[in-house]
């Protein structure tokens, strides 16, 4: 039996898995003494319970207990024993009514005031506070359990999400694997189809044993003709050839001369309904009629068709996987349009093979309507066995397999191969003139521009109006660079350098020459960028001067803008000195090779040009790469011209300008070998590049138009400094070459006396006239090329629009003309 006066405390419990279990109730015994218990019994003597809420039930045992309590109160005065009894009875009633487990809220007990000692009141208050604290602890525990349950739910949801994500990733990986497997299966199927096609095309001539007893009887059909033929126990039969074969026009980069051997071995046979008799006399083997090239399904069993001729007529209904019709070896069968639906489709393809690729579906349907039946005559079998005599006759009098489409392609490739060097030389000659024009500009008009800019620079501090422009500052920079490089090259002794190089071994000289060529190309690629940046820095210098006068730029920033162009000027000067030194060493090395006794070094240097073929021919090139190679060939050609000119004049000066026939012949042979090797190597290189990459020779004319468009720029009205923009495209820097020419030729001109001054004036006038003449030629070529290109583009656009509109109307005419041409060829 449980005591009703015992309180219970709820304590949360947990397991090892951190799972919360239901609350456990632990009994709490209140510490109440006997005096306190007696006082409590006296308190509730005249109690009257007033319910505050009608909804809450009040546990009252019976009315007799109340009456008994009243009687006990009346007899209370008589004796103390009666008081103790009444106190015991009232305490029992209090115990019965004071049930802590029952919920009695919203009630009020009205009693009379009784004097109670303070310690008892304090103890009662403490008990109440303990009870309230216990209730608060219980509420906190309940809240904690709710929070823990929420956390557990969140963790469970996270785990479920992670599992779902893992499942999705696994599914994605499985899908990728399936896709890879499908791709592999497709590749394997394509390989099998290619092998089957090759087996069907390259099937050798196999002997066929014909047995008279095992041949099937021909089925009765409409319009059949039986022609008995002599049976041979052993004969040879040629395998049929595909009638409709697509010509692959894909671009191939392989240098093999015959990449499509299948098209050369087996030639497609054009057969029509109107020329059935001609095909009989011309082609001894039966043609293989094909529905379409896409539906060809050849299997390894197709090689054994010769052994399965007995079942061909019985399996004629299975036309979905079969693409050919096997003829009867004894009887010629005339097939009509009412015989089977497959004959109409086959006749359609047989008639469509003779037409061109531009025929439409409407023309094919018209051909099927007109050619309702084809009379296929039986093949005349060879009555004689194979012999050595027939083999020799075929070798001596046999013909060659030919294919018109492939023959035209090969012929066009040969024409392009021969035509490429001519187009290349036109482009290189134009670029040579452009480089020569910019080279002569440094000797003719740049000194005048430099002199005028220098005078304006001297006058500018004294006048506010005469300020230097960007072009004038750039001219001053270029003149300073040229003069500095000339002074630098004068400190180099050419004779000492010549004998030092001549004393080296041949192999060492060969290595030195190759290193100098590589350095030259690197310097050319870097030099043009330096001069472009120098121009823009001079522009910033002029803009900083204007802003400084207006007070828009602070002093520190203005100082950096002023010092920037001068640092660029130092870098450009160092570059020109280094590049000119490389070219000067290259000229002396070439001079040593020309003047050598056995010409071994010259042959090595010429063979070095042929090494370029290995690095450029057998590679894949785009149009941009081809244009870059063409521009580098232009620069190399012009540098070779300047080098040979310097060597000729240097050798003439060593002979005291005594021009003899031996010297002239020797120099002409050397110049011819060096120049001819350059031309030959460039022609071979570009011819094979265009052949392997399927480029047309008209590509060089497009490059010509590109260069001419930059020269004939509408923004430049007088065409002044137009070659400078072309030099950026070509990659030609004229300053190092000009510095070498001045370094070599200044000692040939006498510097003292009137004769020297008069000679210099004459040379200057000749150079000016030569530059003007070259400029006129360049502008004329540019204008003519641009106008021709515009005319060709307009004609091409108009022809394309007209051809697209009339293409549908001319399809039937093309079919008729193609059939007539094929008939004429066969009759011939």
From Swiss-Prot:
Residues 67-92, 212-236, 297-346, 797-828 are annotated as: Disordered. Keywords: Membrane, Transmembrane, Transmembrane helix. The chain crosses the membrane at residues 428-448, 472-492, 562-582, 722-742, 754-774. It is a multi-pass membrane protein. It holds the Pfam family DUF747. One of its GO terms (cellular component) is endoplasmic reticulum membrane. It is found in: Membrane. Residues 67-83, 212-233, 302-321, 797-822 have a biased composition (Low complexity). Belongs to the TAPT1 family. This is Protein TAPT1 homolog.
